[in-house]
Amino acid sequence: MLPFWIALQFLSSLPVSLPGMPAPREVGRSLLYYPLVGLLFGLLLWLASHLLQGTPSPLHAALLLTLWVLLSGALHLDGLADSADAWLGGFGDRERTLRIMKDPRSGPIAVVTLVLVLLLKFCALWVLVGQGIGAQLLLAPLIGRAAMLGLFLCTPYVRPGGLGQALAEHMPRRAAGWVLLVCVLFCLFLGGWSVLLALAVFAWLRHLMCRRLGGTTGDTAGALLELLELAVVLGLALGL
């Protein structure tokens, strides 16, 4: 179970202690458990939504979104902000884009992107709360983290060194394919057209990454997760 705890420590703000530095092989295997971490997030959000029944819809949605951000420690929002700054400021140049991504400062494009994404997610949750949100809360966190597994499976990792390279090099590819298949079938059963929308957004974002960078980085993987979660909740709110 060590790979699961590695995944949970990396993807969440939950207090997880590991017994020492994990081997690269265990780090690579942790990718297989990313969807399970997403499912855990979805279950916690579902439970919170159940406990918040009777709360005014705007407050209900705001508290759900706050819990959602806190569970991940805003890790992927940081990747989204860095990617937004780099994509606009990179002017189509690969090296400039990668260099801006490493800059810890956030520019106005990053701030505007974060505000818009959080605003849209809040509005979508507000609609879903009004409709009697249920098991659909499982979908977005699960799809977002399964997409990270899919991205590392089919996309080169372009920034040498660090955790991302260990994930990409030591991921058990055959097992990853089976995990993704199970996730897709489960999500299609639960979410229908919203899942197809997420797949389309995944393909489009991956195309943009490959065209600009020749692959992915940790920041663009985080941005992918956030944008796919947004696509799913928007699709559900629109009745897809």
UniProtKB/Swiss-Prot annotation:
Family to which the UniProt record says this protein belongs: Belongs to the CobS family.
Any one GO molecular-function label of the UniProt entry: adenosylcobinamide-GDP ribazoletransferase activity
Pfam family, one: CobS
Cofactor: Mg(2+)
Listed EC numbers: 2.7.8.26
Name of the protein in its database record: Adenosylcobinamide-GDP ribazoletransferase
NCBIfam families given in the database record: cobS, PRK00235.1-5
Cellular localization per UniProt: Cell inner membrane
Keyword Cell cycle: no
UniProt keyword annotations, A-Z: Cell inner membrane, Cell membrane, Cobalamin biosynthesis, Magnesium, Membrane, Transferase, Transmembrane, Transmembrane helix
Reaction equation(s) it catalyzes: alpha-ribazole + adenosylcob(III)inamide-GDP = adenosylcob(III)alamin + GMP + H(+); alpha-ribazole 5'-phosphate + adenosylcob(III)inamide-GDP = adenosylcob(III)alamin 5'-phosphate + GMP + H(+)
InterPro entries in the record: CobS
Recorded name of the encoding gene: cobS
Keyword Cell membrane: yes
Membrane spanning stretches: 31-51, 62-81, 109-129, 133-153, 179-199
A Gene Ontology biological process term: cobalamin biosynthetic process
CC annotations in GO: plasma membrane
Pathway: Cofactor biosynthesis; adenosylcobalamin biosynthesis; adenosylcobalamin from cob(II)yrinate a,c-diamide: step 7/7
HAMAP family membership: CobS
Function text: Joins adenosylcobinamide-GDP and alpha-ribazole to generate adenosylcobalamin (Ado-cobalamin). Also synthesizes adenosylcobalamin 5'-phosphate from adenosylcobinamide-GDP and alpha-ribazole 5'-phosphate.
Membrane topology term: Multi-pass membrane protein
